[in-house]
């Protein structure tokens, strides 16, 4: 196994660990889930570039008769990238004392101000940071509002 193969294995393991954490561990942390709301995806340009570059590497490895293990590892990396960028849906997970947004735990007492923009984006002002929450379904904003009002 070459250094390239080891690096590919490390990236695959890291992406797999992230996917397992995001799907199975994070919803079980910090108590029961009160509400999980799907969010809009951000631009997919980065993901297309990543998967495209991996496809170019696969093509280059196959045409130059590279090691088969490298080809399989590149295919696994492409599949993990496809899953994380296109299959997995980002979401905000509300718990009893806070919520997970972008895989970061934020307690409710850190929210200093909340606003709703004209285009349906919920803006939460924290101490030093502003969260822009773009929900997939506009009706979910009312569910979030009811949950936040009932928990305060």
Curated annotation (Swiss-Prot):
The keyword Lipid metabolism does not apply. InterPro entries: DUF986 (IPR009328). It is found in: Cell inner membrane. It comes from the Bacteria. The chain crosses the membrane at residues 6-26, 45-65, 67-87. One of its GO terms (cellular component) is plasma membrane. Keywords: Cell inner membrane, Cell membrane, Membrane, Transmembrane, Transmembrane helix. It is a multi-pass membrane protein. Belongs to the UPF0266 family. This is UPF0266 membrane protein CKO_01158.
């Amino acid at each position: 196994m070459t250094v390239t193969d080891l690096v590919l294995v490390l990236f695959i393991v890291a992406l797999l660990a992230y996917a397992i954490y995001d799907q199975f561990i994070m919803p079980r942390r910090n108590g029961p889930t009160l509400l999980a709301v799907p969010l809009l995806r951000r631009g997919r340009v980065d993901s297309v570039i990543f998967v495209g570059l991996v496809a170019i590497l696969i093509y280059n490895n196959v045409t130059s008769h590279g090691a088969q293990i490298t080809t399989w590892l590149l295919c696994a990396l492409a599949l993990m990238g496809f899953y994380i960028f296109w299959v997995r849906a980002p979401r905000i997970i509300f718990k009893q004392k806070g919520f997970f947004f972008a895989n970061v735990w934020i307690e409710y007492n850190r929210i200093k101000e909340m606003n709703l923009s004209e285009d349906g984006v919920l803006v939460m002002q924290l101490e030093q940071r502003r969260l822009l929450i773009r929900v997939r379904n506009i009706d979910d904003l009312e569910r979030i509002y009811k949950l936040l009002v009932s928990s305060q």
